[in-house]
Amino acid sequence: YTSGVQRTSTIYSDDEGITWHRGATVSGNSSEAVITEADGRLYLFVRMSNAYYISEDDGLTWSEPKETGFKYNNNCQLSAITYSKKVNGKTAILFAGPSDTSARNSGRIWVGLVQDDGSLQWLDNPYVVNDGTHYAYSCITETSDAQIGLLYEDEDEQLEFDKIAIDDIVNGAATSGVWVENDNGAVVNSSVINTDATASYVVRCLD
């Protein structure tokens, strides 16, 4: 930051922490970052950008930024992990952050499936956390029983911990306990129906 430009770089060790070296700096304006490993590559998610970076050489160099394709609040700390089991036959990265671009509200967990070329294909209908209310700094992890633990700042600016089944995350359920699905089983956030048309929905809730 000494030049007035704020960019993320990595520091790595090849000898179990005896010595440390600085890796390459990413090309875009960025702040603190989180890294996860998947299929032999490193994936870097940074604050101040709706993009991610990929390294094929353990952090020595980084790709140009790759857009996620969805919007989230990048003025907030973010968290990401690689899930230990396959999702739809692919390695899955779980990425958590607030989805409200103007405030730290409406948490989401997005699921990105690693493709053969290293790119991420993001599933539709991210998992909803504290929709419409405060959701700020978070930490996501996998528990010993292969479920997902999410620790985050809630609407009272207190720490809340949720334990979530991976199937609920993949299917886009909600920690608010109630959600709506259309005939195809997709989660619906809103819908407009003309007066001469019909549509059917199913209201579901957590046990």
Task: Report residues per predicted region.
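Loop-centered beta-sheet repeat module
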Residues: 1-39
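Structural motif
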Residues: 5-9, 49-54, 103-110, 156-167
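Trp- and S/T/G-rich repeat-edge/linker motifs of beta-rich repeat architectures
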Residues: 13-14, 18-26, 60-70, 117-128, ...
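Entry beta-strands of beta-propeller and related beta-repeat scaffolds
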Residues: 40-43, 87-95, 146-150
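Loop/turn-rich, solvent-exposed surfaces of beta-rich toroidal or solenoidal domains
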Residues: 50, 70-119
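Conserved blade-ending motifs and adjacent loop-strand segments that build the rim/top face
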Residues: 69-77, 118-144
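Blade-level signature of beta-propeller repeat domains, shared across WD40, Kelch, NHL, RCC1
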Residues: 137-176
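Short, solvent-exposed loop/edge segments of extracellular or virion-exposed proteins
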Residues: 178-194
